[in-house]
């Protein structure tokens, strides 16, 4: 069974998650195919796919335009397939329920906008990658963390919040769903 993973990534965490999903799908007997829609916006939808996993980061209450454009352009190819979607954000790592609810709401709005009704959708906690930010973004991100009560304020370090067990469980659930299709 061939499963396409179409994703977008800015600082690399969504790409890392997509790669982990690919590994978990392989472990389940699937053949994963990866397309980074930011780097390959003209990539075609591979033939004979049995399912689609799509996802990307949530930045400034939006998912990447390149991901939306690619999914919209290939709607006919994935519309009849089992689909799963993942959203990556720092809000998903928040201890505040309102932040988590907001991340869910923005993800659902994105899905509604592109006409996607995935069988499985999740928000994964992302990462705070100070080492990849410029001068201004480092300070903005630090202030956001500080205002939300976070403690990860040392800008000389990166902080990863992704629950890799949750990522692998998501991939396993989707592989089982695709395998159960006639």
Language-model features, listed with the residues they occupy:
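N-terminal beta1-alpha1 ligand-phosphate binding loop
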Residues: 2-30
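A structural signal for isolated positions on well-ordered beta-strands in alpha/beta enzyme cores
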Residues: 2-4, 33, 84, 120
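Conserved beta-strand termini and adjacent loop/short-helix elements that scaffold enzyme active sites
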Residues: 6, 35-37, 124-126
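Short, glycine/serine-rich, charged loops/turns that create anion-binding
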Residues: 10-11, 39, 90, 128
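FMN-binding flavodoxin-like domain, especially the glycine-rich phosphate-binding loop
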Residues: 16, 28, 47, 51-52, ...
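A short beta-strand-loop structural module common to alpha/beta enzyme folds
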Residues: 28-41
């Amino acid at each position: 069974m061939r499963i396409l993973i179409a994703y977008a990534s800015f600082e690399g965490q969504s790409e890392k998650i997509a790669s982990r999903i690919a590994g978990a799908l392989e472990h389940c007997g699937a053949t994963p195919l990866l397309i980074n829609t930011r780097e390959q916006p003209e990539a075609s939808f591979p033939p004979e796919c049995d399912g689609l996993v799509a996802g990307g980061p949530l930045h400034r209450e939006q998912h990447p335009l390149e991901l939306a454009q690619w999914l919209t352009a290939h709607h006919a190819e994935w519309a009849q397939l089992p689909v799963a979607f993942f959203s990556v954000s720092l809000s998903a790592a928040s201890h505040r329920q309102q932040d988590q609810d907001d991340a869910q709401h923005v993800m659902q709005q994105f899905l509604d906008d592109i006409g996607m009704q995935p069988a499985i959708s999740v928000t994964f906690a992302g990462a705070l990658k100070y080492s990849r930010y410029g001068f201004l973004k480092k300070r903005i991100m630090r202030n956001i963390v500080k205002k939300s009560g976070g403690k990860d304020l040392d800008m000389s370090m990166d902080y990863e919040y992704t629950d890799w067990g949750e990522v692998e469980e998501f991939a396993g659930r989707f592989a089982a769903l695709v395998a159960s299709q006639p």
